[in-house]
């Protein structure tokens, strides 16, 4: 079983984004079925608005069972305080949303075989940078993170493509640009495609993993 939580948040009070909902809708449509029309991921979408409580519950549910692949995709604002946040649309100056460390803890504890976290937000590579836990690797077995930008960088949207730059390349990769000779796409091949496609662009993606064998997306 493959399951995914696809999140695209635009409606931030005072700092709205334009294309995160487009990002999420496109990602949902791409991964919920294979090229031949057969089912692929069981997708739960969250579009435009989401509270901290609702996002926390949804992420917990995503990682709660023993799926072959559990994929979290987030497009929205990120904050670089306290190890990083996935900002929710009910954010405040005292609470920006869901802590990246909390997301990673849920993924690390999950019994799912492959846990893939894809973040198209500013400071995305903050995910996985926290202090080592109990002298073990920050990334638990089976966890992979693909981040749109370095931990000190912003992630850009582009009006001409009506997507985030990072997600636009993810879309191209999932449409076949990142496929191997057998037509399979893995998190590693997807990252490689995005990284090479960005060329000299200032925003640099980041790939972190602790896995012995990838399952195709």
Regions found by a protein language model. Give the residues of each.
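Cysteine endopeptidase catalytic domains of the caspase/legumain-like
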Residues: 1-217
